Amino acid sequence: MRTVFVLFDSLNRTALGAYGGDAIATPNFDRLAARSVTFDQHYAGSLPCMPARRDLHTGRLNFMHRSWGPLEAFDNSFADVLRDKGVYSHLITDHVHYFEDGGAGYHTRFDSWEFIRGQEYDPWVPMVAPPLDRFRAEFSDKHY
């Protein structure tokens, strides 16, 4: 079994063609939705983003417990459930809050994870030059 769980932060479903949005073309998302299981009757139970993520991870309403925080030791995340069923899970995220104090635990439930830097308040600034040009500029005139 292969499972890809796609979560977009602060994206209204009406922005995607697969859900009837027509303001912009979203052919890649539309193709993905056509080949996937989609949720048509899901509503956020807790807001904003991190409490909503805890809802999704645990299947419980976060606002009933607290406003903001990490997954707790007693929380059963969907990544835990997948692992128990023999399904490997991998997280790819640009969400820096997963790695800050108070947001810890969300990424650790997955079998593996990858953090794409440079979003939100992450101080890292990516290089945008093509790799070969960037390395030539950095090292071609250096003699060691």
Put a short name on every predicted segment.
Residues 1-37, 46, 83:
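Active-site-proximal N-terminal segment of extracellular/periplasmic enzymes that hydrolyze or transfer
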Residues 11, 34, 38, 51-52, ...:
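Residue-level signal for pocket-adjacent positions within structured domains
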Residues 13, 38, 62-66:
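Short helix-loop boundary/capping segments at the starts of domains
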Residues 21-24, 49, 63, 98:
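Short, electropositive, low-hydrophobicity segments enriched in small/polar residues
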Residues 22-25, 44, 69-76:
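A short beta-strand-to-alpha-helix junction
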Residues 37-44, 88-94:
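Conserved S-adenosyl-L-methionine
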Residues 42-55:
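Short, surface-exposed acidic-centric catalytic microdomains
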Residues 53-144:
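Catalytic-site neighborhoods of secreted/periplasmic enzymes
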